[in-house]
Amino acid sequence: MKVFLVHHGEAAGPDVDPRRPLTAAGRTAVERLAIAAAARGAKPVVVWHSGKLRAKQTAEEFWRRCNALAEFAATKDLQPDDPPQWMLHRLRGETRDVLIAGHFHHLPRLHALMVGTDETSAGFPPHGVVALETLDEGQTWSELWRLEP
């Protein structure tokens, strides 16, 4: 099973638009990353996002580029301040390849839990993608590759 952790693209500030959609530069960077992820073989069966507009827009681009037949849904446990253990527990029950479009500080903490490192040393790339794989139903994870904008 593979998991693709995707930090949403650059978003407008709340003073520009309180919904915080992706900026034009953010959309362009997300499109490039999605194309590159697809070229590396990213083909999730399910795409989850936090429900926030910027994460949804990011997830939609990856869904279009990587597997437009994938299940697509907003899901709980992906808000910036949610404990990452909740999502890790959910992933242990999954057998499908999953793409998660979410936020800092949640994604670096989830990544650190998955690979067993200190959050600060994990170095999750801002607005980037990290691909991980488990061969033992989510007990241990290894990083396959990462992409930065």
Which residues are covered by each model-predicted region?
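Active-site-proximal alpha-helix that buttresses catalytic centers in soluble enzyme cores
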Residues: K2-D82, L107-P108, T117-V129
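Short, low-complexity, intrinsically disordered N-terminal peptides in bacterial proteins
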Residues: M1-K2, P149
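Residue-level signal for well-ordered alpha-helical positions
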Residues: E61-F62, L113-M114, L135
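Short phosphate-binding loop-to-helix
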Residues: K76-T95
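Glycine-rich phosphate-binding loop signature in dinucleotide/nucleotide-binding domains
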Residues: R40-K43, R92-R96
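A glycine-rich beta-strand to alpha-helix segment
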Residues: R96-A112
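Domain-level recognition of soluble alpha/beta enzyme cores
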Residues: T117-S142, R146-E148
